[in-house]
UniProtKB/Swiss-Prot annotation:
<feature type="transmembrane region" description="Helical">
    <location>
        <begin position="311"/>
        <end position="331"/>
    </location>
</feature>
<feature type="transmembrane region" description="Helical">
    <location>
        <begin position="140"/>
        <end position="160"/>
    </location>
</feature>
<keyword id="KW-1133">Transmembrane helix</keyword>
<feature type="transmembrane region" description="Helical">
    <location>
        <begin position="173"/>
        <end position="193"/>
    </location>
</feature>
<feature type="transmembrane region" description="Helical">
    <location>
        <begin position="240"/>
        <end position="260"/>
    </location>
</feature>
<keyword id="KW-1003">Cell membrane</keyword>
<dbReference type="GO" id="GO:0016747">
    <property type="term" value="F:acyltransferase activity, transferring groups other than amino-acyl groups"/>
</dbReference>
<keyword id="KW-0812">Transmembrane</keyword>
<feature type="transmembrane region" description="Helical">
    <location>
        <begin position="91"/>
        <end position="111"/>
    </location>
</feature>
<keyword id="KW-0472">Membrane</keyword>
<feature type="transmembrane region" description="Helical">
    <location>
        <begin position="338"/>
        <end position="358"/>
    </location>
</feature>
<dbReference type="GO" id="GO:0005886">
    <property type="term" value="C:plasma membrane"/>
</dbReference>
<keyword id="KW-0012">Acyltransferase</keyword>
<dbReference type="InterPro" id="IPR002656">
    <property type="entry name" value="Acyl_transf_3_dom"/>
</dbReference>
<dbReference type="InterPro" id="IPR050623">
    <property type="entry name" value="Glucan_succinyl_AcylTrfase"/>
</dbReference>
<dbReference type="Pfam" id="PF01757">
    <property type="entry name" value="Acyl_transf_3"/>
</dbReference>
<protein>
    <recommendedName>
        <fullName>Glucans biosynthesis protein C</fullName>
        <ecNumber>2.1.-.-</ecNumber>
    </recommendedName>
</protein>
Length: 384
């Protein structure tokens, strides 16, 4: 394992943070979209629906590429067991903390808002379990997937150095055209798996834990591995940080196809399978778009950016119940969708930042929401 730290990737830190924070306008716009959610405005907005669809079509694919990149970077820095422990603690502890402190109260709130408290006793044991699985994992699903990907990638990451010893990467072999074909085929494979499950045992697709543990992991594992490969091969990383007109145009066409599928597709037909193919290739092309823009605009050190990089996970964790509270109790009193959307951003972001500052002053909460053990004062003094 290397003891020499890799150069700081400021633009990747920034992109990861902004993708996390983008969850706030994503969920607030969901209130005002045509999509059915826990809470919705009286009249939907077409432009907020379009905005919401655009974010949804690529955000998490790019996020998992960055996660794979940093995961492999740390894999080279730590012994295997320590690497796994650190990575799982960093995402597992905040996830387990957020369930009783955030998503459980959120679930109780929604039961009263949607007037479902009287129906709860009538549900079967499985229906209660499945409802809790969906509602308690909620927006924390990506943390669960990261824990699974970290565990699964032990074997993959261990195999990478062995492969490097026996073969040398060829720049021509990892072109964006070839990657596009590979991800198209991966999207087709995922669609085929989903269709087979739909034919053989369709009910399992409505199971919350199966969706998070199996389906979401299967979809995002190629992006996670791609991120690790981008760290291993500088030429591959350079392809993503260099603007590509083909990727930009391809992403635009893919988004139009995504919208058409949303508009005319049917869940009983091939809508979800088609969406998986579209978002697989669009996610790849948006990696180039986002990385190249980020490399040009965000590749610098800034105290303000560092603040939001450090705060992004906490803000993301607390924003969801705040958004639902806003949608349930404040949205009905604002007639304008635009004003409601802007007020929602101010409301959620403002309270989230206040809560973030409060939690920084409580060591136990700071540990629980970050997964990072506190640095002992004695150690700091010794270093100083």
């Amino acid at each position: 394992m290397s003891s020499v730290p890799a150069p700081r990737e400021y633009f990747l830190d920034s992109i990861r943070a902004w993708l996390m924070l983008l969850g706030i306008p994503f969920h607030i716009s969901l209130i005002y979209s045509t999509h059915s959610w826990h809470v919705n405005s009286a009249t939907p907005s077409w432009w907020l629906t379009l905005f919401n669809d655009f974010i949804h079509a690529f955000r998490m694919q790019v996020f998992f590429v960055i996660s794979g990149y940093f995961s492999y970077m740390l894999f080279l820095r730590y012994p295997l067991k320590r690497w796994w422990k650190v990575r799982v603690e960093r995402v597992g502890i905040p996830m387990l903390t957020a369930i009783p402190l955030l998503t459980l109260p959120q679930f109780i709130l929604l039961q009263y808002v949607k007037e479902k408290t009287e129906n709860w006793p009538t549900l079967s044991a499985y229906e209660k379990y499945n409802t809790l699985a969906w509602e308690l994992i909620s927006h924390l699903w990506f943390l669960l997937v990261l824990v699974i990907l970290t565990t699964v990638s032990i074997g993959i990451f261990t195999w990478f150095p062995k492969r490097q010893e026996t073969s040398k990467p060829r720049p021509a072999a990892i072109s964006l055209v070839r990657l596009s074909l590979i991800f198209f085929l991966l999207g087709m494979a995922y669609a085929a798996i989903r269709r087979i499950i739909f034919i053989v045992y369709p009910a399992i697709l409505s199971d919350g834990m199966f969706n998070f543990i199996v389906m979401q992991t299967l979809f995002y594992v190629p992006f996670f591995i791609l991120g690790a490969l981008a760290f291993i091969h500088p030429d591959l990383k350079a392809r993503f940080t260099t603007p590509s007109r083909g990727c930009t145009l391809g992403a635009a066409v893919a988004f139009i196809a995504y919208l058409l599928n949303q508009r005319y597709g049917s869940g009983d037909a091939w809508m979800y399978e088609t969406e998986s193919v579209i978002t697989m290739v669009m996610g790849l092309w948006m990696v180039n778009v986002v990385f190249s823009l980020g490399h040009r605009l965000l590749n610098f050190q800034s105290a303000r950016v560092t603040y939001f990089v450090n705060a992004s996970l906490f803000i993301y964790l607390v924003h969801h119940p705040l958004t639902l509270f806003f949608g349930a109790y404040i949205t009905p009193h604002i007639s304008s969708n635009l004003i409601g959307f802007l007020c929602g951003l101010i409301f959620v972001m403002g309270i989230a930042l206040i809560l973030y500052e409060i939690h920084l002053r409580i060591p136990l909460l700071k540990f629980l929401f970050s997964g990072k053990p506190p640095v002992k004062q004695e150690s700091r003094a010794a270093i100083g």
